[in-house]
Every structure is written in C-alpha cells, then in structure tokens.
Amino acid sequence: MSLVRTRFAPSPTGYLHIGGARTALFNWLFARKMGGTFILRIEDTDNARNTEEATRAIFTGMEWLGLDWDEGPMKGGDCGPYFQSQRNDIYDAYFKKLQDAGRVYEDEGAWRFRFDRSKPVTFHDLICGNITIDYRDASNTPDMAIRRADGSYIFHFVNVVDDIEMKMTHVIRGEDHIMNTPKHIQLFEAFGVTPPVFAHMPLILNQDGSKMSKRDVGAALGTYPEEGFLPEGVMNFLALLGWSPKDDTEIFSPQELIGRFSLEAVNHSAAKFDITKCRWVNQQHIIALPAEEFALRARPFCLKAGLPDSPILDAAIATVQTKVQTLAEVPDKIRFFFDLGMDPEAVSKVQPEALELLFKLADRLEQEPEWDGHELIGVLKAFAKENGVKMGAVMFPARVALTGLSGGPDLSSVFSLLGREETVRRIRSFSLD
C-alpha cells in the first residue's frame, strides 16, 4: 500500500468552524496513525469572499489545536503551491486534457464536464459503506460546470486536480459532500486516475437536532482559546463528535487518540454538539495537568483580569485546579485572595449568632503558636466542639468572612495563603450589614 496522504482544504471565507476543525482533526489523526502525510491546502478561488484574516485564522486555529501539517503554507513541499489561487497553470493544463478528450463543452461562456452516463456510479465509503448514484438520466443530473465564463475554475474541478497532483490516498470530509463524490469520481476517471478512498463523516447537529450554524454557541474555534479551553481538551471533545472507542473511555491525550483512532469506528449517525460535555472534557484535562503547568496556563487570564502579579498568585491558582472547567474561570475564583468582596447571597446565609463565634474564633487563631493550614482545620474542629456547635456552624461563616463566597478553595489553603494577620483581620471585620 502506498504511503497514506490526507488533506484539510478549507476556504478562507470566514472563521474556522468547529466542523472544519473536526475535519482537520480526523485527517490529522488518520495520517499520524498510519505514519502518513497530512497536507494543508487553501482553497482560495472565491476572490469575492476570501480574506487574509480568515486565512490567518485557519493557521492560528490549527496551530493552537496542535494539528501540525507536513506540507502546505509555511512548510512547503513537493506538490506546491498550496494556495489554489497560485495553481492556475496546472488547472489550465488539466482542462486542456479534457478538451482534447472531448469531455467538456461550452455553455453560454462557461464550460461543462460531460458525464459518462453509461452506468451508475458506485463507490465504497469507509464510514457509510457502498453508495450508488445513478447518473444515466441527464434531467436529474445535468452536466456540471467546471469553468466560469470569466475563466476561473469551479470547486469540483480544482479539488480533483489538486487531489491528483498532491497524490491523495484518502479524502475524509463531511457527509454533505457525498453527493459531490460521484462527480469527482467521474473526473478522476476522465483523467485516467484511480480515485482515492473516501470517508464521509456524520454531520454535527445542535442538541435540538438542527444543523449547527456559524452563529451557534461553540461554533467558532477562535473563541475557545479566549474562553480558557485547553487545546488538548478541545481536541479530545472534537474526536468524540462522531468517533468513539470500543469501550467507555472518554478522556484521551493527543497521543492516545492517535493510537486508538480508526475510520471504521466513526459513527454513521449525526453527532450532537454539547457545550456542557465540552466543558466537562476540558475540566478533566485541567485536573490532569501538573500544578506548575496549570498555573502557567492560568496566569495570563489572571493578569488580564487585573489580578496582581503577586508572590502568592501561582499558589492561589493551584487552589482551584479541581474546581474550574476553563482557565477563564480562575480569576473570579481566586480574586478574594487579593481583593475581598462580599457575595450578598452568601452573607445572607450566615446566621446572626455566628458573629459571636467568629469573634471568638479570631481570638483563638491569633493565639495559635504555629500557622499551618491543615493543622488549623483541626483547630476549627476543636473550637466547634468546645462551643457545642457542629463543624458547619464554624466553617461556613469563616469561609464567607475570609472569601466573601459560599464555596471555593479548601479553607486550609485559604488560611495558609492569607496568613495569620490577614485571616484574623478579615474575620474581625466581617459583619452582616
């Protein structure tokens, strides 16, 4: 078998959609699994809609996601150029081949490809199975235009020519292209080339079953870095949109995905996009990070949110590693370490009789010979017992007084990072007003 070659061929007419990112991922995973080559090709033949900003967004999105390409823009390769707008001489040569073979004809200035109508077109799809489409009736399947009256070439033609020139062995794309495949197969055969193997992935739908559009929440890949998602978390989630392993495992590193991915395990039915599931998957990857790495990744979000570059910042970040689903949630979770505010709802849950307990607790903490967060939890337990109350009657008011919140990091960490003086000051300053 020849070396596997796959490609991602986006059009730079808008931001990188989550569906396009999944297409790129499945092509990348298959190439990496098979020890093959992954190619990035920019299909920029729509001059009216192409933008440099969209092209940059494609590069940025793929680099962020970790989808490195072996050939393509900025990498080069033997089959370039990798922008379709720079390949017109190649297209002209292939168009002439069709002219010489009598397979094209002019129609009001445009040029159409003459289908072979002697038999239906049948092909085997690695995901969808055997597919047959009957092209014998010209009224149902008119000959397709491949060149416009202005001389520019249409998607179907350039797509096939590039796949031939770039020696593609597998074309992995969305199932919305299934009806294009027989057209493309006829072009391959007209050039005397064996078509690549096709695999059409299921569509991505919203939870209500509607087709996901560019305006839907989570549709734009570019929003994920801004919202604090990890690239490995998003990659993991995208892989589960249509593919599943043979067991119940859901969390995979990129290398684990490469090892377990197969096109045969891609589902036939449509995938449902669930942003809640995406956040959960991302949280599992956050929890799995070494503490130092988590702090390194969360730090820019904290500084951007106005938190000080304090000596305790990294330690404060570490206190919420198991409590956030995205990095963007970190600043608000730890802001109290640096700027104490009070959540009115949390304060309203503190009983008036707790104030006297808190003042006594402040005196007790001030006199503790050693200041160790874990040991101080034991002090609170003893204090509660001495005063004839349950632990919660001490812990909750203390948490609100120290953090302004009803939930958050372990109190042992709060004690340790605030220190004795600030802890005592906050407890004594707390009021229900």
UniProtKB/Swiss-Prot annotation:
Main subcellular location: cytoplasm
Binding site for ATP: 214
Disulfide-linked positions: none
UniProt-listed Enzyme Commission number(s): 6.1.1.17
Motif ('HIGH' region): 10-20
Ligase as UniProt keyword: yes
This protein's UniProt keywords: Aminoacyl-tRNA synthetase, ATP-binding, Cytoplasm, Ligase, Nucleotide-binding, Protein biosynthesis
GO molecular function, one term: glutamate-tRNA ligase activity
PROSITE patterns: AA_TRNA_LIGASE_I
Catalytic reaction equation(s): tRNA(Glu) + L-glutamate + ATP = L-glutamyl-tRNA(Glu) + AMP + diphosphate
Gene Ontology process terms (BP): glutamyl-tRNA aminoacylation
Subunit structure: Monomer.
Job description of the protein: Catalyzes the attachment of glutamate to tRNA(Glu) in a two-step reaction: glutamate is first activated by ATP to form Glu-AMP and then transferred to the acceptor end of tRNA(Glu).
Family recorded in the similarity comment: Belongs to the class-I aminoacyl-tRNA synthetase family. Glutamate--tRNA ligase type 1 subfamily.
Protein name: Glutamate--tRNA ligase
Species name: Akkermansia muciniphila (strain ATCC BAA-835 / DSM 22959 / JCM 33894 / BCRC 81048 / CCUG 64013 / CIP 107961 / Muc)
